[in-house]
Amino acid sequence: MKEEETIEISEKEKDKERNDNQDTLTISWIEDWRNEETATKNENNKNNNSDGDSDDDDYYDDDEEIKNSRYNLFLEKILTLESNSNLKNILSLNINFKKDNKKSKETDTAATTTTTTTTTTTTTTTTTPTATANKKYIRTNNLLNNNNSSSSSSSNNNNNNNNNNNNNNNNNNNNNNNNNNNNNNNNNNNNNNNNNNNNNNNGENITYITSPLSNESLESTEECCFFLVHLPITKDLIFNQFTCLLIHLFQIEYNNTIIINNATSSSSVNSLNRSYNNSNNNNNNNYNSYNNRGNNYNNNNQQQQQQQNPNLKIRDLEGYQDCSHLKKLCLTIHDYLTQLLQRNPLIWYDSIINWSLSTLTIITRLLIILKNNKSQQQQQQQQQQQQQQQQQQQQQQQTKNKTQFPPPPPPPLRQPITPISAMVRERLDFYSFRSLLSLVLHLTRIFSIETFIEKSNVTQFLDITSKSSSSSSSSSSSSSSSSSSSSSSSSSSSSSKTIKPKKLPIYELGWILCHLGKKNPSLILGLTFNHYLKNIGLNSNNNNNKVNSKSQYIQDINCFQILEFLALQPSSYLSIIFQQHIDKIISNHKSNKNKNNTQFLKDIKTFLMLITKDDVFLSIGLPIILDKLSPFGINQFDNNNNNNNNNNNNNNNNNNNNNNNNNNNNNNNNNNNNNNNNNNKNNNNNSIKEDNSSEKDIESIKEILEKVLLGNSQVISFYSKRILLVLYHCCFGDSNDITFSSYSTSTLLQIKNQTRYNVSIKLLTSIVKDRLEKQLINKLYSPILNNNNNNNNNNNNNNNNNNNNNNNNNNNNNNNNNQQQQQQSQEIENSTFINNLNQDENITFYLNQIQCNNNNNNNNNNNNNNNNKLIKEKNNIIIKLISLIGMDSIYSSLIILNHIISKLKSNQFIQYFYTLVEQFQAVNSNTIEFFINDLFKSIDSFSHDDLITLLNNLLELVKITPPPSSSSPSNLSIYNETLKCISSNWVVLLKLIKHPNLIESNKMMSIEILYHSFNNRYNNNNNNSQSIQQLEISNNNNNIKKKEIYPSTLLSDKEMLEIRVLLEKILNLIFKSFKEKNSFERLKKFEIYKNLYLLICNGSSVYFSSTIDLILDSLFSKKTDMIIKLPILCALSPANTLPPPNYPANLVNAGSGSGNFGNGDDDDDEYGDDEYGANRNEKEELYFKQIINPSLPLSQPLIMLPMQSSLLEINYERKYYHYKFNDMNNPNHIPFTNKPKNLKKRIENNQSSAIDTTNNNNKNNEILTYKKQRMKKKKQSIQQNGNINNEQQQEEDDNDDADDQNEQDDYEKYNILNNENDLQSFIKSLVLYDGGGGSGFNNHGDINDRLQILTNQFLLRVSSPYLEPSYENYQEILPKQSHYERDIFIRNLFQQNPFLYRVLEIISIDGRELTKCLEVIKSLLVNEISYWYQCRNSYSESPIKSSHYHTTILLVKALINAEFIIHPLNLSLELFDKIKAEEISYILTSIWNFIKDYQPNPSQYQSSSSSSSSSSPPSNNTIIPTFKRVFSNCNTTPYSLTLKAIFHNHIKELCFHYARFFPKKYY
C-alpha cells in the first residue's frame, strides 16, 4: 500500500510539472498524445509497480500490450527522458550550476532522511552495481557529497528504512550503544549532514546523466535511427536521447581519468581511516567521557574522509567503466547521420548541425564546471583541515587531565591531487568530442565554410546579453541535488517556473573554428575576423563584475589555436592581410548609412586581439592600427626612433620596425579617411548615447586595452608614447580641430559623448596602473636584489671550493644564476616602456595637459560642474601617468614638481603635490629637500606670473595643515618636512622682498611664507619637533645636570647662529618699515615683521638678550635719525662706549651703529649709491688718522672728504653744543631744534645714510609741486595787478619757506611719535610673549627673566662712571638746575634719545627691576623739577607746548606703574594739562620728597593675584604690573598739601576731581 501511495504521489507531481512546462519546453503533438494514452499508461504503471521489488529489466519483459505496440514503447522511452526537469535545463543550454543556499539546505536535509528514487514508470531499489546502471533517470548530486548518497544506493528499501530508524535512535542514545560500530557510523553520517550543508553551499551541482539507450543493444539504437527518418515527428526527442548518450559517455571517460590519477592516494586513505575507526571503537568501552570524545572524533573522521576523497568512484556510473559498448552506439549514430547528410543534405543539414553544436556546448560547459569545482574543493579542504586541527587541539586540552589514554593520532594527510587543468588540454582524447567534431567537419565537406558559418548564425549565437546571463543563473538555481521524490518534484516545479524560452541558443564554436582554420587558413582568416573574434569581447563583459568561465575558456585556449596556422604565414603576407582588413573596416564604416560606430569598434577590437597573440603580429600590426586611429602621422611623434631602437636588444624587433616604416609610408594616404571617420563619430555622439548597445561597444574597447596594451611585449614599449597619445586623444579631443599643443578648456566643453569619455578614462587608468607600475617596480627594486644575490652566490662558490661535499649546492647556485640572468633580461626589456616616456619632451607635454577648473560665474552652473568633473578626471589620469614617470628618476621628479608649483592654482597644486611627493618619496626619501633647494636656487629664472603663482602655492602649502582625521600619516610627514626645508631657506625668502619681478603688493608674500613655515613647524600639534624655547630649556637642563647632549633633540651651534643672523635681518627690516611714507603700508609691514620676529624668537632668553642689545645700539646710532629721534649735531655716546678725550665724535657714532647693527645687506645698498663707492672706508680712515696723529705741517691743508664737515664747522658744532649746556637755565632754550637752517641742511645731507632716499625724493617732489603751483598763482596775480615791489615779494617768499619748513617738521615729529609707539609695542611684546607654551601671558617666570635682561642692558648704557649725589646735595640746589656731571650726562642722553623714557615704562612692569634704576630716576626727576621751575613764566598758560611735557608724563607713568608713589600722588597726571608750569614743579617736588622718605626696596614687592587671575593679554597702551608694593605706616597727608593748594587755586576747573583725589572716609 505504501508503494502504491508513493506511485500516485509521484504521478500527481509529474502531471503538475507537465502542466507548468507546457509554455516552455513541451511540444504540441506530445501533449495531444498524452491525453489519448493516459488510461493505458496508468494501468501499465500500476501493474509494473505492484511487483514491489522488481528491477528495471522488467520494463522490457515480454508483455502482450507492449509487443503489440512497439511504437508506443518507443515513445514511452523517449517520454521518460523528456519529462525530467533537470534534463530540460541542460538541453536548453542553461548550464550554470550555482545553487541557492536555501534550496540546497532543504535538499541536503531531505537526502539524509529518505533515499528513494522515482521514475515515470517504476520505483526500483538496487542492490548491485549492475542494477544502478539500469537507472533511466537523471540524478543531480553535489560533487563534494558523492559519498553521502552512495550509502543509500547500496541497500534495499527495507534496509534503508531500518537504517534511518536506527540513526534516529542512536542520535538520542549515543552513550548507551557504544559497542555497535555500524550504528556509530550511521550516527556520524547524520551528525555530519549539517556541517556538510554549511561547508558546501558555495559548491556547484554536477548533473550525472544515464541514457535509456546505455544498456540497450545496437538494435534499439538502430531502431531510434530508423524512427528518426520514418517518423520525423519524433526527431527532436531522438536527438535529445542521442545527446544524453554522448553526455553519459563523456562522464564515464572523465571519471576514468580521475580514478586512474588518484587510485593510490584514495586507497591509502581508505585503509588508514578504517584502521583508525576500529581503534577508536575499541577504546569507547572504557570511559564515558572518552566515549563522547570518540564519537565526536568519528564525526570528524567521517567528514574528513568525505572531504579528502571526493574523486572516488561515482555510484551512478559504476556499471559503465567499460565504455566500449557506448562507443559502438555512438559510432552507429555517427555513421547513420553521415548517411543522412549524403542522401539529402538540404533537409538534414540544419537539424544535424544544431544538434551537434548544442551537444558540444553542453559537454564543454560540463568540463569547465568540473574544473572550477576541483579548484573550489581544494580550497575548502585546506580550510577544513585547519579547523579540524584546531578542534583536535582543544579536545586534547580538555581530556588531558580526565583520562589516562593518549589522544588519538591525527588522520594522515592526503597527497595532492593532479590538477584538472592538465586534463583540459587533453579533452580531444575523449571519444565524445572526436565524434561530434568529425561530424561537423563532415558538414563542412558537404558545404563550404562560408555556408557553414551562415547556417550556424554565429553572430546571433555569440550575441550575449545580460538577459541571457540572468536567465541562466535563475535556471541553474533550480538544479539542486535531491534524493527523495518529493524534493525532486518540488525543485523541478520551482525551476520550471523560472525558465523562460530562449529564441537563440548560445553555442561554443571555438574548437570548431580552430579545426576549420587548420584545414583552410587563407579562407578562415577573414571569416574569423568578421564573424567570431569581433564578438569574443562581449563574452567577457559582465555587468556584475563576475568571472565568466566561458569567456575565460575562449581567450585562454581558442585564440591560441586560431593563431597556430597564422604563425606559419610569412610576415609580408600578414602585413598585406592586416592592411587590407583595416581598409575594409574603414570602407564598410563609410558605406554604412546609419554610421554605426559599434560595428566599427568591434572590428578594430578583433584586429587588436589577434595581433597581441604573438610579437611578430604586434610588430607588423601595431603601427598600422596606430596610423589608422591616430590623426597624426608617425613622423611627428616618433622623432626618436633611432634612440628607441638602440634600447631594444632583439634583432627581430629592429627588422620589424624597418618594415613598419615602409608600411607606414604606404599608409599616409589613408589618414584623411580616418579623419572623416572621427568626424562621423563626433557627429553621431548623441545617437550613440541613445543607443543602449553603445555601452557594450565602449566596454569592448576596455577589453582591447586590457588584452593588447597591457600585455608583456617589448614591441608595445617601443610604441608606448604613441599609444598613450592615441588614448589621450580618444578621451579629450577631436582630430580636425584640436592639436595637443594648442589644447584649451573651451575645446573640452565641446565633449558631448559622456559614456565614451568615461570609458576612455578607465582605459587610460588601467594602462597606466597595470602596465607602468609593475615595470617600474621591477626596474627600481630588482637591481638591488640582483646585487645581493650575486654577492651571496660568490660567497657560496668560495665555500664550495673548500668543501668537496657541496657539489649539489654549486649546481643549485648555477641554476639560480641562470634564472636571475633571465629575470634581468626581462626587466631590461620591460624598462624600455618607462625609458621612452622619461624624456624632457614627453614630461613637458603631459604636464601641459593639466588644466584648471572653470570658476566663471555663469548662469549655467550645471554645465560648469560637469566641465569641472571632466577636467578633474582628465587631470587625475595625467597626474597618475606623470607620477610613474617621475618615480623613474629624481631629475624627472624635480621637473614635474617645479612645473606644477609654478603653473597650477593653489587648490589643484596642494592636491597633486601630496599625491606626487608620496610616490616620489617611496623611491627617494630626499625628494622634498632636493625640490625645495632646487626651487629656490632657480627662483630668478621664473617669469612674473609664474613667480606669483609659485609664491601663492607655497603660501597655501605652508598655511594649510592637513587634518589628521582625513589625511594619512604620510601626508603629515610630507608637510612637516616641507616646513623644515622652507624655513631653512630663509635667506632666499628675505631677498625676494627686493626681487625685480615682483610688484610692491606681492613683495611681502615671502615673509608670510616664512612666518607660516616657522609657526606650523613649532606649533603644530602633530609635529614632533621642538620649539626654540623648548630646546633652550632642554639645553639648560642638560648643562645643569651634566648629562649627554644628543644632537637629535638639541639645536646645534650652527643652527643657533643661523637663527641669530635671521633675527638680525628681520630687525633691520623692522627699522626700515618705519621709513614708509604711507602709514597703512608702514603698519602692515611692521606687523608682519613683528609677528615673524616674535615667532622665531619664541620667548627665548638668548635671542631676547641679543634683540635688546641690537635695539639699544641702534637707538644711539645715526641709523635711527628721523625714525625714532631727530638728528643730532654732535651726539653723546652711551656709557658703555665712552671715547677717549681727543677722539672725534663722528667716528664714535659711526662705529656704534656699524658695530652690531650695520652688518646687514642695507649697508652695502646705502653706500653703493655714493660717488666714491667702496673707497669711502679707506678715505675715512686716512682722514681720522690725520686728526688723531697729525704727521703733516700745519701749513698744508688736510685731505678732505666730499660732503664732509670742515674743522671750523666741527669746532663750531662743539661750541654750539657747549653753549646749550651753559645756557640750559635759559627758559627760552629749546634743545636741539634752534640750529641754523644751512647747518641743518648740511647735517641732513651728511646723514643721508640714516634717511631713506625714496622717502626724501617723494617729499621733495611734493614740495616742488607745491612751489610750482604757488609760482603759477603769483604769475597770474602779477599779470593782473602789474608789477609789485621786490621787497614785498621777498617777504612773502620767506614766509612761505618758513611755513613749509614748519609743516615738514611737524610731519616728521608725527612720524617719529608713531614709530616710537610701534617700537615700544614690539619690545613689550618681546617681554610679555609666552612663546606658545600654552600658559598665556601670565608666565611670570619668563617675563621676569626678560625684564631683568632689559634692565641690565639699559643700565649698562645709562649708568655713568661719575659720582652719585646724595639727597642732601640735591636738597641744597632744588628747584634750581643741577650741574653735577652725572645729572648732566643723564639729562643730555635722555634728551638726545627720548625713547629711553619708554624703556623705563616697560621696566616698570616689575617694580623690583625699576628699583635698580632708582639713581637714574632721581637724576631725571631733578632735571624735570628744575626745568619746569625755570620755564614757569614762558609756559605758564599752556605747558603742553613744551618739549618736556611728554617726557615728564612718561617719567611719572613709570613711577606710578612701579608704585613708587601712592594715592593721591598717583593721580597727579590728570592735572598737568590744566595747571601752570610752576605748579607742575611743585607736584614733582612732592613726589621727590615722598620717594626720599619712602625709598623703594625689592623686598617690599609681592606677587599680584589679580594679574595671575587675568587670562587676557595686555594691550600695547597699558602695562599690568606683575608685583605690588606693600606700604607700611605710610602717611600721605604732608605730601598731599600741595595738591590741595592747587585745587583751591583752580576750584572752577578741578572741583569735579576733588572727590577722587581726597575721598571722604567713613568710620
Curated annotation (Swiss-Prot):
Tell me the leader sequence span: none
- For this UniProt entry, which segments traverse the membrane? 350-370, 877-897
Question: Would the keyword Nucleus be found if you checked this record's keyword annotation?
Answer: yes
Q: Where is the composition biased (Acidic residues)?
A: 52-63, 1160-1172, 1289-1303
Q: Where is the composition biased (Basic and acidic residues)?
A: 1-21, 31-44
Q: Where in the cell is it found?
A: Nucleus; Cytoplasm; Nucleus membrane
Q: Name one Pfam family in it.
A: INTS5_C
Summarize the subunit comment: Component of the Integrator complex. The core complex associates with protein phosphatase 2A subunits, to form the Integrator-PP2A (INTAC) complex.
* Family assignment from sequence similarity: Belongs to the Integrator subunit 5 family.
Q: What is this protein called?
A: Integrator complex subunit 5-like protein
